[in-house]
Structures are given as structure tokens and as C-alpha cells.
Design a protein with these regions (language model features):
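A juxtamembrane structural motif centered on a specific transmembrane helix
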Residues: 1, 7, 34, 331-390
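Helix-turn-helix-type domain boundary/helix-start signal
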Residues: 112-114, 265, 348
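Hydrophobic alpha-helical transmembrane segments of multi-pass inner membrane proteins, especially
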Residues: 20-28, 32-36, 40-238, 277-337, ...
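Transmembrane helix boundary and interhelical junction motifs in multipass membrane proteins
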Residues: 169-174, 254-259, 270-272, 289, ...
Length: 390
């Protein structure tokens, strides 16, 4: 028992306690919101989310016992496994339509009658593989080499292209692209390369729009938010009803469990993509602001850990996680407030999607791993951190 006690004390001494406190607060708040969402055919979103959180924290604890540098050495195994998982999903996966209008094979069935979306795991894997790629280039002084920058782009293009062309998942593609931009910028990639990227996008997006790569139903989703009232029972339904729910909560909300629109299920997929509307109706403006403050505090603290990192790999992992939380928060809340189109992007740590939640907690584990192991004496060097963005 004494050895166990010492181990716990040693872990707590090294752990980033503020990061844990932020995450635990977010977990409790998300569970309180989902506790009020009615069951669907006997399926409790609260229970599913609780299981996802439990699995996520177990994964976090497991990951933090390893040095992230040693984990990154397995980048080829992680990347290869994720590619095989995506291929398997495309062959044997399940097609489930979400608020993003997707109806492609993006899920696989797992024991217990549950489903898992591999693209969520690939996001976390990308933090590790792309971070390792940047780290290798830095060690070889190749971060300014044009050919190596092209290969970095190819690395990012694999998940982005797969999401756009194969799975028709625009939301995930946007997340991967933003991760690529943030991690590359943090590594000090020269701005001229970003100019080239945006110039290529200016050509590629119109081509994808007109060539059929972006399907018609996706085009409808991407344009409906401009005038949702023109299709109030179709593509505009979720955003119109979501805005009504958020507004009906006013300042303090109707109360947890007492929000009539939540209980009626007025907003489709309110447990997942539209959990922000549940907070708006139940806890009002105050509840919505609390979500924003918690996520902003999380992002700020992750950036602090990135800044304190003793190597580019550690800071890149943190920036990848920051990018996921940032772009998904903007996309989801923007969608709920009719500022952005519906793309099926979940609100980090709050939405009931088991795949998204569990995998995001693994991302949290990697960030915590950086915080705990950045000063390990066998790895720290005086000049190891070269991250011009910081």
C-alpha cells in the first residue's frame, strides 16, 4: 500500500494539475447537460458519454506513463494502423447520417452494439505523426527545404483527401487542414509556403465545387445557412430550431431538466452536434458563456504547455490538440448561431459522440504527457526548442 501511495503522490507531483482540473470541470458540465437529454429508443446518451469519458481517462493515465518522445518513435506503426482502419471502414463500415448530411461508410461496429468513427482516432494520430515529421525535419535542418515542405503537404493531404473524396466528410477535412496550418506555423515554416497553399486552394475549391467532388447535398448544406428560412423543414431545420432553443433560454435558462424544447427533442441531434442549444435553453446565456470560457481556458493552457515544451515534437503535439479544440469549437458554435454552415463537427468534450469524446481524451493524454515528461533529463538540451512562433 505504501508503494501505491508513493506512486500516486509521485504522479500528482509531476502532473499538470490545472489541466486536470479544467478537464474534470468540463467532464462534469457535459454530463450534467446530457443527463437532461431524453433517451432515444432506450439509449442513454448520458451513459454512453460517461463510458466514453471513463475510457478516455483510462487511456490518458496509460499514455502519461510513457515519454511522448518514445511514443512518437512508433509513428510509422500508428500511421499504418490508421490507414488500414480507414480502408477497413470503407469496405466493411456502417453508413450513418449525421447533421453534416453524411451518409457514407465512416463508422464501424464494436462490441456492445456501439459504433466507432475511426476518423476521430486519426485526428489524434495526426498530432503524433505530423509532429514527429516536423521534429525529424528540424533535427536535419530541413524545415526550409522546398521538397521537404511539399512532402509535409503530402502528409497532410492523405487524411484531408480521404475525408473529402472518399468519405465526403467536409467537417473532418477542415479540422485536419487547420491542424496542418497551425502545427506548420508553430514549427516556423516560412510564410511564403502558406501563400502558395492558399493560392492552390483558390484554384482547388472552385474545381471541387464544379466537378462533383463536393456532392450536391453537401453544397446544399454549405449554402443553406445563408437563408435557412427558405428550407425550414429540410436542410434549414436544425439551425432554425437550434437558434430558437438558444434564444428561448434568455439569461439564466429554463433550468436543467425543465427545458421543454430539449424534452420534446425539437432540435435534431441535440445530444451531439447541437448540445450547445441544450445549454442555451437549459442554462441560458450564462450556460453558453461558461462553455466558451472553459474551452478558451483549456486552449490557453495548452498553448502555455506548448510554449514551455523543451522540443519541437512536444510543442507540435500541443498545437495539434489546440487546433482540434479551436476549429471544432468555432465550427460547432458558429453552426448553432447561424454564422457557419452545418458540417457535422462536434463540440469538443461536450457532444455525446462516444468516438469523438474518447479520442479527444487521448489527445488530452498526449498533452499531459508532454507536460509531465518535457523536463526528463535524458532528453532536455539547451537548444532543443526551436519554435519561432513562440
Amino acid at each position: 500500500m505504501q508503494n501505491i501511495g508513493r506512486s500516486i503522490l509521485s504522479y500528482l507531483k509531476r502532473a499538470d494539475k490545472l489541466l486536470w482540473l479544467i478537464m474534470l470541470t468540463i467532464s462534469i458540465y457535459s454530463l450534467l447537460l446530457l443527463r437532461t437529454v431524453p433517451k432515444d429508443d432506450g439509449k442513454s446518451y448520458f451513459l454512453i458519454h460517461l463510458l466514453a469519458i471513463g475510457a478516455g481517462y483510462a487511456g490518458t493515465l496509460f499514455i502519461t506513463f510513457f515519454d511522448y518522445r518514445n511514443l512518437a518513435k512508433l509513428w510509422w506503426l500508428v500511421g499504418g494502423f490508421c490507414l488500414l482502419l480507414l480502408v477497413y471502414t470503407q469496405i466493411n463500415g456502417l453508413a450513418i447520417e449525421s447533421s453534416g448530411g453524411m451518409n457514407t461508410r465512416a463508422w464501424i461496429e464494436i462490441p456492445g452494439g456501439l459504433t466507432f468513427q475511426p476518423s476521430e482516432l486519426v485526428k489524434i494520430a495526426f498530432m503524433l505523426t505530423f509532429g514527429k515529421h516536423l521534429s525529424i525535419l528540424q533535427e536535419k535542418d530541413l524545415l526550409k527545404n522546398p521538397l521537404q515542405i511539399v512532402l509535409l503537404g503530402v502528409h497532410a493531404l492523405i487524411p484531408v483527401g480521404w475525408m473529402v473524396i472518399i468519405q465526403k466528410d467536409m467537417g473532418s477535412a477542415v479540422v485536419f487542414f487547420f491542424m496542418f496550418l497551425v502545427m506548420s506555423f508553430g514549427a516556423g515554416i516560412q510564410l511564403r509556403y502558406f501563400a502558395v497553399i492558399f493560392a492552390l486552394m483558390a484554384v482547388a475549391i472552385p474545381y471541387a465545387w464544379n466537378s462533383g467532388i463536393i456532392a450536391n447535398y453537401q453544397k446544399d448544406r454549405l449554402t443553406t445557412f445563408l437563408h435557412p428560412e427558405e428550407d425550414p423543414i429540410g436542410n434549414g431545420l436544425q439551425q432554425l430550431q437550434g437558434r430558437i432553443s438558444i434564444g428561448s433560454g434568455q439569461l439564466w435558462g429554463r433550468g436543467l431538466g425543465d427545458a421543454p424544447r430539449v424534452q420534446k427533442g425539437a432540435v435534431p441531434v441535440q445530444e451531439s452536434d447541437y448540445i450547445f442549444s441544450v445549454a442555451g435553453e437549459s442554462l441560458g446565456f450564462v450556460g453558453c458563456i461558461l462553455i466558451l470560457l472553459l474551452l478558451l481556458l483549456l486552449m490557453y493552457h495548452v498553448l502555455r504547455i506548448a510554449h514551455k515544451s523543451t522540443d519541437l515534437l512536444g510543442s507540435s503535439i500541443c498545437l495539434g490538440f489546440f487546433a482540434i479544440i479551436c476549429i471544432q469549437t468555432i465550427s460547432n458554435i458558429g453552426m448553432c448561431l447561424l454564422f457557419l454552415p452545418v458540417m457535422g463537427v462536434t463540440l469538443p468534450f461536450f457532444s455525446a459522440g462516444g468516438s469523438s469524446s474518447a479520442c479527444l481524451y487521448l489527445g488530452f493524454g498526449l498533452v499531459e504527457c508532454v507536460a509531465m515528461h518535457r523536463n526528463d533529463p535524458e532528453h532536455v538540451t539547451l537548444h532543443s526548442r526551436v519554435s519561432p512562433a513562440f
